Amino acid sequence: MFGDHKQFPWSMGFQPHTQGETRVYGRYLAQNYPNAKIGVLYSSDGLGRDNITGFKQGLGDKVGNILVEQTYEATDPTIDSQLVKIRTSGVDVFANFTTPKFAAMAIRKTAEMGWKPVHILHGISLSIETVLKPAGLENAKDLITSNYLKEYGDPAWNEDPGMKKFVTFLDKYLPGENKHNSNIAYAYMSAQTMVHILQQCGDDLTRANVLRQAESLKDLELDVLLPGIKVNTSPTDHYPIQQTRMHRFDGVRWQGFGPILELD
């Protein structure tokens, strides 16, 4: 919605748009699990409808592999009944397009049922601190998602200049905060982008020029973005981040695999 430059010319999203993300999952399954029997859980709102639409587009001619779709309301106390219906349908792939609270419920309940499908988790719910730990890290092993951020604590980034700047900033301005919280990395990255935009504005800080500069970002690299992922915008493109990479949870941290993927 926030990337719709025609309807909302003064608004701009930031993270990858949800239809693009779920299209990536659909393509991944079509290519790697062409004979999969798929069950999908998503919210009964605009976000959920975008998720299932993108997913079906990504599956392409494999869309018939979806055997069951279940939805939930944000006010539902549990999603146990939906998960039981999905499991009993005989699927071997579970596309879990839920928000964080319900994602934790789904991960935990799936383990309690002794069910081990190929489990695709929407990137909105990939936080180790707020989703996977409450669900039980042992229950989250082998989850598959996509991500565009470096993960604090991953040894791969111990000597990374961008990660070092991020850690130094938090130690100075937010001492004691949990650096594993991906929401903090997202906020830092958003602020870093805003600083860049304001610097591009120079002395012209009118609304029109701020928007003009926000629409003129070219291959901007941010401290906590994965290598190869860059921010780009234009007057007709209000989606700053349009790249991601597949990840699998090893029981401790997310491990990236495969190339950088373009979202469309």
Residue ranges and their predicted role:
Residues 8, 110-186, 260-262:
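Extracellular/periplasmic periplasmic-binding protein-like sensory domains
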Residues 1-3, 18-19, 44-48, 72-77, ...:
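Solvent-exposed loop/turn segments at secondary-structure junctions
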Residues 30-35, 56-64, 84-91, 108-115, ...:
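Sec-exported extracytoplasmic/periplasmic mature domains
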Residues 21-24, 71-85:
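Structural motif
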Residues 172-185, 195-254:
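Segments of small-molecule ligand-sensing domains
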Residues 38-42, 90-100, 106, 117-123, ...:
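Periplasmic-binding protein-like
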Residues 1-70, 119-145:
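Extracytoplasmic ligand/sensor domains, especially the bilobed periplasmic-binding protein
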